[in-house]
């Protein structure tokens, strides 16, 4: 999407053109909340950050002058607890929600850099207490099959976490690990000695059916991320991870944001407008435009946002990582960031 352009004054005093997104994604490419929260909120206060295009290496600038909403993505968003109040300070009116990937691969050691599961569940609950219901979405992503993990193992892992999150979230998003489609993932798993197993359609259906049965005690919205397979017969829908409907529900009082999304907010009495959905008691939204991001994968439902992260910068060291070419590349960039932690770039250079 072509965002509006503004001019910024860089740290070195130079003037530069920058795109000024209304919705920011932080980030699909790295774990900003876990490792770069201090950097991000510093750059938010400065007013801009630099971003390098992963396809052509061209550096550009992102201004936060027009930002009204942030979608955070993380496996360990605990550092956000110290910063969330800044979204509403210094004249800002920025709302957010968190896509919280809360997996359990502790026994198998697939996510060596994340905190213990109990700590991550505690963080989830603290964030909900801070932000309110609907602001923290549970992701178990990806669902991986290996010589040590079968479908029943995954279901037990999901059930354990799902039981503990009841009352703290209303949604579970998941995906089946499609390893063959991602060369980096395949290479990382093979180099780390993980004997993975590709999902077949029968296993996908088996998992979906059993998950649907488990969900009778939770009543979560179940959704897949970027999946071609249709399993709606089990009450599982295709997700929008950057979700205009959720953004509208959480920030319907923000007229600038609603105008951008093409959402008209109405108080209702006996008559309810056609094709509307409830955002609060007695308040509905009617959308007049489709906001799907054409730059995402074919089966991705996300709306347009500006991602500000960069690949090869996440030190979680997950064995199946799609965002790092190698562990060494990520650690090298992380060390470089620590030498210059508030640089305009996430890598410190």
For the regions a language model picked out, list residue spans one by one.
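Conserved Radical SAM active-site core
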Residues: 1-111, 117-133, 325-349
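Short, solvent-exposed loop/turn segments at secondary-structure junctions
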Residues: 77-78, 103-105, 143-145, 179, ...
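Conserved C-terminal portion of the radical SAM core fold
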Residues: 119-186, 207-227
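Substrate-binding surface in catalytic domains of secreted glycosidases
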Residues: 174, 191-212
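A C-terminal junction/extension of Radical SAM enzymes
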Residues: 202-298
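Local cysteine-cluster metal-coordination motifs and their immediate loop/turn environment
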Residues: 297-326
